[in-house]
Amino acid sequence: MGAAARLSAPRALVLWAALGAAAHIGPAPDPEDWWSYKDNLQGNFVPGPPFWGLVNAAWSLCAVGKRQSPVDVELKRVLYDPFLPPLRLSTGGEKLRGTLYNTGRHVSFLPAPRPVVNVSGGPLLYSHRLSELRLLFGARDGAGSEHQINHQGFSAEVQLIHFNQELYGNFSAASRGPNGLAILSLFVNVASTSNPFLSRLLNRDTITRISYKNDAYFLQDLSLELLFPESFGFITYQGSLSTPPCSETVTWILIDRALNITSLQMHSLRLLSQNPPSQIFRSLSGNSRPLQPLAHRALRGNRDPRHPERRCRGPNYRLHVDGAPHGR
């Protein structure tokens, strides 16, 4: 049965009425960019998550896919895999630079073409190149991450989005092919201290430069390894992009030790607008897709769930950074 056939009657009525209204209001939307995290029925209709797979045939997996993301990770379902190698980060020994954007949906950092940042190891059989760092956050603390652990959300989630550079020439091609993408997720809590990498992105001089949609600010001399905890475990599963077209080509790697930012930094994020300055303010917060069924997919981890009290010790629980001292 197709996605449209499975659509509930009330939702179908809302969709068709909104589509009819949208056809008479202003220019036609770009079909590749016509989506939102919340259904906007005040003015132009913009389809939220329940409608993604219905308004564009290329996004059908958003409605009918069986390996969709994000998911709720129940730790009792995680299979301990002692043969998972540590994660490895390669920056060529150089500092990261790039542009921080307010896309109207996310806070997004796009790295410059050089240096090339790669991640490998863990469940990855190939080297994957960093394409984007994306920050998702909620309107209230404890409810901003896409993924959950044991039904518990976090205030924010940082996603490092990579494509397989050994098999594909660019992100677009990789998103359509097997073993195409890898996304590392780090959870974020609100506390009295702040992760040093996130502090560079969220300090007042930086975050106020991207207050509105399409604002951008160039950053340099960033040390990406500072984003990661000193030691951590990870959980991996096969899933999808959590935005249209919801391609099921993603190896997700969830870092199991959360980062911190301050309440002031979180407040600054919530003051970012998803609209340009000429339009009414709407907070960028709440930019996450609802949870998707895990179904029969396997969850693997490098930490033995039979002994959760044990601390992560040894090289397998550290990020290996090429050229950095002490295995970092």
Curated annotation (Swiss-Prot):
Signal peptide feature range: 1-23
Coiled coil spans: none
Domain of life, source organism: Eukaryota
Localization (cell): Secreted
GO biological process: one example: one-carbon metabolic process
Pfam families: Carb_anhydrase
Keywords annotated in UniProt: Glycoprotein, Secreted, Signal
Record-stated family: Belongs to the alpha-carbonic anhydrase family.
Protein name: Carbonic anhydrase-related protein 11
Lineage, broadest ranks: Eukaryota, Metazoa, Chordata, Craniata, Vertebrata
Gene designation per UniProt: CA11
